[in-house]
Each structure stands twice: as structure tokens, then as C-alpha cells.
Amino acid sequence: MTNTTNAAAATGLTSTTNTPQVSAFVNNWDNLGMWWFSIALMFVCLIIMWLICCLKRKRARPPIYSPIIVLHPNNDGIHRLDGLKHMFFSLTV
């Protein structure tokens, strides 16, 4: 049977109760003037999320169809047809 006091020393693990400065830092977060750090961290996360959304939008696939611009022989102007609709029209006619 091992001694419990020597087991902690043998493994090198210590309890967090032995480090009072950690709990003091967490409890005195507002007193240390760290409120600005929380706000800055929130803004950094928002900027990262905004950049991720912009990069995903730029990497989006282009549309399947491309617009077709047709100039009619009677010269009544330029007509823009969507390629996909034009393809369906040509299949049905």
C-alpha cells in the first residue's frame, strides 16, 4: 500500500488548492482591471467569424449557367437570356 502524501509528490501532480494566486486572480478579475480584456476578446472573436464568412462567400461555386446576350436581327435591342432558361426553352420547342 502506498502512502497518499508521497504519491502526489511521486507523480509530480499538485492540487490547485496549493496555488492560491490562481483563485485570487480569478476572484479579483474586476479589481485587476481586466474587464477590458473580456471585451477585446469578444471583438477579436467577432472579427474572426466575420473573416471566415467573407472567405467562404468568395470560395462559393460559380453558378451553373452563364448569361447569354443576344442581338436580334431586327435590331430592337440587346436581350439578356439566362443560359439555363434558354436551354430548357430550346429543349421544349
From Swiss-Prot:
Carbohydrate-modified residues: 3
Protein keywords: Early protein, Glycoprotein, Host membrane, Host nucleus, Membrane, Transmembrane, Transmembrane helix
Changes after translation: N-glycosylated and probably also O-glycosylated.
A GO CC term attached to the entry: membrane
Transmembrane domains' residue ranges: 34-55
Protein species of origin: Human adenovirus C serotype 5 (HAdV-5)
Record's subcellular location: Host nucleus membrane
Main location: host cell
Similarity comment: family membership: Belongs to the adenoviridae E3A-1 family.
Protein name according to UniProt: Early E3A 10.5 kDa glycoprotein
Protein topology in the membrane: Single-pass membrane protein
InterPro entries xrefs: Adenovirus_Type-2_E3A
Pfam families the UniProt entry points to: Hum_adeno_E3A (PF05393)
UniProt lineage: Viruses, Varidnaviria, Bamfordvirae, Preplasmiviricota, Tectiliviricetes
